[in-house]
């Protein structure tokens, strides 16, 4: 049975889209048929992150009624299927966000997991993704402004008939996780389903247009995202093996030298 999650945030800059991309990639790696749809039709970033910004058909054309959803599905990392939105203002103006309901009706027949990357903040375009998902996951930073805006998004979700599963706290100082978790659960009244630490490899992976769970699979952020994907899918993670360091020239030379002396 398909599970539809909308990934939302109360403000821009929380790392919501990066979380969506990596979570979708990890679900696909765990063997789940997964599709990530960029429903942020005004400020689309999924395509940019994955190098799909120049594809001929996007969600814009589908929502404008000039293309079929099957034409806007592209292959991403680890078998993840991706539906990017366009980056043109004209495409944004022609797209009807209400048609996302119809699009979902087609997608739920094809996948086990459908992730919807929603627009940040409270807007007309963001209401439908909050309402149509089985559950909404909030991406929050450990700052007061982000928490307050996430609370507004939670309230809006409930007003339009949606349900918030919980929140993912992103970019966290690892020494403060316990305090932040308690504060977040108290303010938002939802469980914390994952904590992603601040990780410099996130930016490096983004520059390479590659999800961090693939580029740096044992980095702190990757390990956190893998735990979240395991929790959502019910699939146990394979045991991580530490990378074996490659023997350098000096090491090889030293071995040969001492072998000869022996």
Name these PLM-found stretches.
Residues 208-224:
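C-terminal boundary of histidine-terminating zinc-finger modules
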Residues 21, 222-229:
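Short, amphipathic alpha-helical "lid/cap" segments that border enzyme active or binding sites
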Residues 98, 102, 106-208:
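Conserved catalytic-core segment of NTP-binding enzymes
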Residues 33-38, 45, 115, 139:
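Short beta-strand "acidic-cap" motif of Rossmann-like dinucleotide-binding folds
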Residues 227, 231-262:
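P-loop NTP-binding site
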């Amino acid at each position: 049975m398909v599970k539809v999650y909308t990934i939302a945030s109360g403000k821009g800059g929380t790392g919501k889209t990066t979380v969506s991309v990596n979570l979708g990639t990890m679900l696909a790696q765990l063997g789940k048929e997964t599709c990530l749809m960029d429903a942020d039709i005004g400020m689309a970033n999924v395509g940019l992150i994955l190098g799909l910004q120049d594809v001929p058909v996007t969600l814009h054309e589908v929502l404008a009624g000039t293309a079929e959803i099957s034409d806007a599905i592209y292959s991403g990392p680890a078998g993840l299927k991706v539906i990017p939105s366009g980056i043109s203002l004209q495409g944004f103006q022609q797209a009807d966000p209400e048609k996302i309901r119809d699009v979902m009706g087609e997608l739920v027949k094809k996948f086990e997991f459908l992730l919807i990357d929603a627009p940040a903040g409270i807007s007309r375009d963001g209401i439908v993704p909050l309402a149509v998902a089985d559950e909404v996951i909030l991406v929050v930073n450990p700052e007061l402004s982000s928490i307050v805006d996430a609370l507004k998004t939670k309230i809006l979700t409930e007003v339009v008939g949606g349900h918030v599963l919980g929140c993912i706290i992103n970019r966290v100082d690892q020494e403060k996780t316990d305090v932040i978790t308690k504060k977040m659960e108290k303010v938002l009244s939802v469980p914390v389903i994952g904590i992603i630490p601040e990780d410099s490899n996130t930016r490096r992976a983004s520059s390479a247009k590659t999800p961090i769970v693939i580029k740096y699979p044992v980095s702190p952020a990757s390990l956190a995202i893998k735990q979240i994907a395991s929790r959502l899918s019910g699939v146990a993670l394979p045991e991580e093996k530490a990378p074996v360091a490659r023997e350098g020239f000096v090491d090889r030379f030293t071995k040969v030298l001492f072998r000869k002396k022996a």
